């Protein structure tokens, strides 16, 4: 049985349907990227998969060995969240809370899991630092480690590279790919980045006009009208930003980075 199966799924707000006729499956080991313009319903679908939004029609079915609370989630950060005054270790450990029941303290099992995930994401050297003092890329790694503490199966990522500079973005995409391929974690990611989606993902779900425009493999997607229309739109935005001087430029290398992670984030893809 598939990990997640959505059949004729629909969502509505105040009686107004915002998404309908969604039909797709997520298998173990998939890397699914959800694409679409702003307002296409991507975040609504994420809430539905997490059990935070009840469908107005259809059904979300989970495999026998998966429950909604076993899905790790990395949401987009708000300014308040970025200024959270806790240590990195405390933030990562909080990802274990959903599996602790009524137990009010972390045990050896949770601490070992947090240590493993911090090591896997190469942030062990940051464990005692305050979360709000970290760079944007470091904070995303911490939140990703937190999401992994909540699951060993599926993570949902809501635009995980939003606001990051180009070099840190490359490193983040590589890290997510490693989590998928080496750790065997199924990835479901919302993104506006068409090029990254078709490079790293195994499957694409394209939403638009309140419905599903495409679901299938990346190779199949490259031959659709939805792909070419969205790609042309991305190129137009890129040209406009470049002409207006609004594209982010890679930051100059820091001769004395505070940590090994900050130094690695500034490596240029060779």
Where are these predicted regions, by residue range?
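Helix N-cap at the start of a conserved alpha-helix in ABC-type nucleotide-binding domains
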Residues: 166-168
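H-loop/switch region of ABC-family ATPase nucleotide-binding domains
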Residues: 191-192
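H-loop (His-switch) and adjacent beta-strand-loop-beta switch element
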Residues: 204-217
